[in-house]
Amino acid sequence: MDPMELRNVNIEPDDESSSGESVPDSYIGIGNSEKAAMSSQFANEDAESQKFLTNGFLGKKKLADYGDEHHPGTTSFGMSSFNLSNAIMGSGILGLSYAMANTGIILFIIMLLAVAILSLYSVHLLLKTAKEGGSLIYEKLGEKAFGWPGKIGAFISITMQNIGAMSSYLFIIKYELPEVIRAFMGLEENTGEWYPNGNYLIVFVSLGIILPLSLLKNLGYLGYTSGFSLTCMVFFVSVVIYKKFQIPCPLPVLDHSVGNLSFNNTLSMHVVMLPNNSESSDVNFMMDYTHRNPAGLDENKAKGSLHDSGVEYEAHSDDKCQPKYFVFNSRTAYAIPILAFAFVCHPEVLPIYSELKDRSRRKMQTVSNISITGMLVMYLLAALFGYLTFYGEVEDELLHAYSKVYTFDIPLLMVRLAVLVAVTLTVPIVLFPIRTSVTTLLFPKRPFSWIRHFLIAAVLIALNNVLVILVPTIKYIFGFIGASSATMLIFILPAVFYLKLVKKESFRSPQKVGALIFLVVGIIFMIGSMALIIIDWIYDPPNSKHH
């Protein structure tokens, strides 16, 4: 009997509890949706899976305790909201300012609200399907709906999402660890040394930290890492808001001899023109005259308006410091996939639901409403203030953009270190369910093998390292995974499972019609986004020197 199977779940009342008395040791360890596809862990019954579940997630509980198909939930409403918020929050927040820069503020807000509302509706469909289908496992719902192909489809979508998550975390290490090393060692951008090279660093971190952690048979630190990840993202948003009011526009050129931007009203400032990759015309940047004196530049041309920081700049006819409200270009195609990537939490909804104390669909829907709304606010703040800091110069990974104006800044350094620790500890958590699912599909009912355990982890880490080294920018990971697996998990799979498994409603009922429309919208999003992204790859090939 599958430990998470609920034979009688379809008679559970919507507004009443289906759980019994509470038992100790709440389920507090669900990670990021980009961290773990929990369904594959619960579905597996091999020794590794059982060890992972009983030691890594369920504390002192035995797996046998879940043999009761109607086992009681133990996790409070508040902790469930925290767990789901943590499942939603991930590396996708770092790409939202880039999405706003390529859609405009108003269009981005409309799209953000739309994806959030559609995610809530998707959770509603998923919860109802789980009730009617009698299972709290994503792959099992696929199997009940379409047999083996449905199970494989769910497995591939969840695995792709987790591989994309692993790659995005390794990209963050590739981007941010060199900046931390440069800050501590006082190095300039291009010194020719090997140790600030992000490609080397991700290999060293993978071999020295990620692979050893991935060889553990259980990950008991998951709950602590999850809480730390969410805390560091809150800190990240706070620093983004704070830095908006410190960094002037146009962006001054970083003076490496000083190490930070320091503005002095008594110093003469020269305006120089530097190319702006994201716009057709140039952007006005500032240079300190005491360090650089561009030939042929008239000192009188440096006069202009005075910012509160004391930085003078020359007004330009095409002012780059004005926010754009509606933007459409080739990079706009990445907006919806980035947003979809940021809101994926659906593989974790059902495990969190199964552990909710006094659970009901209505209560779990409220948990989802609170969690998604909270993350919506954080996403909007991070995107808006990040965009209003850099405008058209924003990077596809927001933290990396601050390297343009700082080499050593304590708040940013703290954020970078916190994010680096969080993502480094999270990569093994993402790898665990992928390995468990691969083991379940390829080596069913085989005894645990350390050799297989090691080889699967090593191959997955090696493939992700190659991917991160070869792909020049994180936006392609956000874009491709968001347009494919994230769209499948948010739109397509919940809708088709609902249409297939919920039998008591006629196909012409408003609920089924709504699910059908939702499915069509998801297919359009998926095909449209993938087509536009591929066109962008063809006509605007990646610039390898971008990072």
From Swiss-Prot:
InterPro entries: AA_transpt_TM. It comes from Pongo abelii. Belongs to the amino acid/polyamine transporter 2 family. GO terms for molecular function: alanine:sodium symporter activity; L-arginine transmembrane transporter activity; neutral L-amino acid:sodium symporter activity. Pfam families: Aa_trans. The chain crosses the membrane at residues 105-125, 152-172, 196-216, 221-241, 333-353, 370-390, 412-432, 454-474, 477-497, 515-535. Disulfide bonds join C249-C321. It comes from the Eukaryota. The gene is SLC38A4. GO terms for biological process: L-alanine import across plasma membrane; L-alanine transmembrane transport; L-arginine transmembrane transport; neutral amino acid transport. This is Sodium-coupled neutral amino acid transporter 4.
